[in-house]
Amino acid sequence: MLSSSAASCTSPNPDTDNPDKKVRWSSEKRRRASSTDSESKTHLDISKLPRSRRPSRLTVKYDRGHLQRWLEMEQWVDAQVQELFQGQADTSEPEIDLEALMELSTDEQRTQLEAILQDCPGNREPFISELLSQLKRLRRLSRPSK
């Protein structure tokens, strides 16, 4: 029976000049290489990995479609707000927090939006109506889908 311990094995060609020389096992070399490999994996460019190997912690909690709808909604809101405030160069555009609006009732949402957009020079009513209708179709991000 073969033994796997280094102490019980001797080299077939012993080195008489250096009796303290020990046998290096190939598994030790592999073990060392694997520890350095795991360190180098943390420094890899994630964009070069295939999609199946990319870390997807965010999409574990929320599905991609839901996140995409939120992103499209936020981009639409930003574009509409820019269009509403197009005539005013010195006024900063207001921030509309969709998550905070989702927590409110429809009447409170309308009141909040009117307060945020009170300095808007354009007609804000069509934007508010469209935003409220889109918010009804959008689910909250704080409640992940199962």
Curated annotation (Swiss-Prot):
<feature type="region of interest" description="Disordered">
    <location>
        <begin position="1"/>
        <end position="57"/>
    </location>
</feature>
<keyword id="KW-0963">Cytoplasm</keyword>
<feature type="region of interest" description="Interaction with protein phosphatase 1">
    <location>
        <begin position="21"/>
        <end position="25"/>
    </location>
</feature>
<keyword id="KW-0650">Protein phosphatase inhibitor</keyword>
<comment type="function">
    <text>Inhibitor of PPP1CA. Has inhibitory activity only when phosphorylated, creating a molecular switch for regulating the phosphorylation status of PPP1CA substrates and smooth muscle contraction.</text>
</comment>
<comment type="similarity">
    <text>Belongs to the PP1 inhibitor family.</text>
</comment>
<keyword id="KW-0597">Phosphoprotein</keyword>
<feature type="compositionally biased region" description="Polar residues">
    <location>
        <begin position="1"/>
        <end position="16"/>
    </location>
</feature>
<dbReference type="GO" id="GO:0004865">
    <property type="term" value="F:protein serine/threonine phosphatase inhibitor activity"/>
</dbReference>
<dbReference type="GO" id="GO:0005737">
    <property type="term" value="C:cytoplasm"/>
</dbReference>
<feature type="compositionally biased region" description="Basic and acidic residues">
    <location>
        <begin position="18"/>
        <end position="28"/>
    </location>
</feature>
<dbReference type="Pfam" id="PF05361">
    <property type="entry name" value="PP1_inhibitor"/>
</dbReference>
<feature type="compositionally biased region" description="Basic and acidic residues">
    <location>
        <begin position="38"/>
        <end position="48"/>
    </location>
</feature>
<protein>
    <recommendedName>
        <fullName>Protein phosphatase 1 regulatory subunit 14D</fullName>
    </recommendedName>
</protein>
<dbReference type="InterPro" id="IPR036658">
    <property type="entry name" value="CPI-17_sf"/>
</dbReference>
<dbReference type="InterPro" id="IPR008025">
    <property type="entry name" value="CPI-17"/>
</dbReference>
